[in-house]
Amino acid sequence: MATSAISTVLGKTSVKNSPSDFSTTCRELNETFASGRTKSIQWRKWQLKQQWWMIDENENEILAALTSDLGRHEMECRSPDILGLKTDILEHIEKIEEWAVTKPIHDAGLLFGRLGKARLLMEPLGVVLIIGVWNFPFLLTIQPSTIRVVTGGPQETSKLLENKFNHIFFTGSAKIARFITAAAAKHLTPTTLELGGQCPAIVTKSANIELAAKRIAAVKFLNAGQICLAVNHVFVDPRVHDEFLSKLEHYMRQSADTGHMCRIINRRNYGRLQDMVNKSEGKVIHCGLGPKGKNSMGPIIVANVSLIDSVMSDELFGPICPVLKDAVSEAITAINSLPRPLALYIFSSDNAETERIQSGTISGGVTLNDVTMHAGVPNAPFGGVGDSGMGYYHGKYGFLGFTHQRTVVEPPTWLDYVMGFRYPPYDMGNLSKLAVPNRLGFRKGETMEDQILGSSRSR
């Protein structure tokens, strides 16, 4: 949910902040959807273009609100919330006809495909509840859709969830997601969850240490590490540990010296982070000062920590970077002992090493020798797995997440001439028509070694 200045800008869309208005709002939106006027491609394109101009004409106010509430530098404000949102809008305007067109089912066979004209209708689900979060409030809430905005916190969210929606999209923590999904279950409402988690980085003995330190320091600096995709902690091979630690400290200090770091969002989260550092048994290395003002925290490295250290007890969501001295085998074991993360970052120049880590772990996505980049791949799904989320979005995959793919088929009326056997009384003489021959020709008694890859047949 949004903070004060951001709430004011978001409220320019169509804001409903009183819980007493929520039922009315949901009813009005459902009535609008039921009228059918929001379903046409023309209407959706028009709405997308209105969103573009809303962002474009209010750009200075958006930037000012993000700076006021989050203390972010203009470059950090523009990159995700302005650039990211405008890019999404353009992609949807350009692609929505292609995504929404009725699609013939080409592999449906003679009966259903050619004769029955089997096809998929791409129909919008209906009224969707999007529960965004404060770290990227515009990018994560004003995604292409028809909007009524509610700003607030847990109380407003709880009241909203008493209403029935056709889909719920939530960005936030796994703890709150459990509450969201429990409320959604009462109405059998499907959900998409983007949750984050403790995203690890692995720096192997073959890594470019300079590059790894520079890029990990940068993502811990961005939005003061308050990003679901930020590196939470780093596993470093003992043979390059000291070199990496030295370079990481260098780049963190360099970033802090710019004065461009934003602050921690509120006093509660600031206190949570300070408490984790104070209780740590690792070596705490302060790498410079944070911004002036309240809730200010500079970059911090915590070295020589274990998995049971206080700074490893939860997703950090701050400018703190625990460093664990572990070789690849130990790092894989440690990663698999924790909830599945939204992202995994592997720094290595050894392809076999990289493949070993990828195949030995599970995560929402993977970026090699960089950070967060997999989330920006065009035409690719983005989402978590396990405790880091469920479902996908971005581009076509977000469109499909809010779409019901409705199968339609038109069997010809003369079909009874060839399928009359389906009606009672049943004639056992037609039993052969229900037999399924082994058209692939595989044999009983085959072993795993007999299986041929790259072919639909097993010989």
Where are these regions (language model features)?
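ALDH superfamily catalytic-core signature
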Residues: 13, 175-307, 368
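N-terminal Rossmann-like NAD(P)+-binding subdomain of aldehyde/semialdehyde dehydrogenases
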Residues: 2-120
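Residue-level signal for inorganic ion chemistry
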Residues: 44, 89, 147, 168, ...
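Conserved residues at the C-terminal ends of beta-strands
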Residues: 131, 153, 171, 219, ...
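Rossmann-like NAD(P) dinucleotide-binding subdomain of oxidoreductase/dehydrogenase enzymes
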Residues: 108-211, 449-453, 458-459
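Conserved C-terminal structural/oligomerization subdomain of aldehyde/semialdehyde dehydrogenase
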Residues: 3-9, 31, 40-43, 145, ...
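Structural signal for hydrophobic packing residues in well-ordered secondary-structure cores
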Residues: 33, 52-55, 59, 70, ...
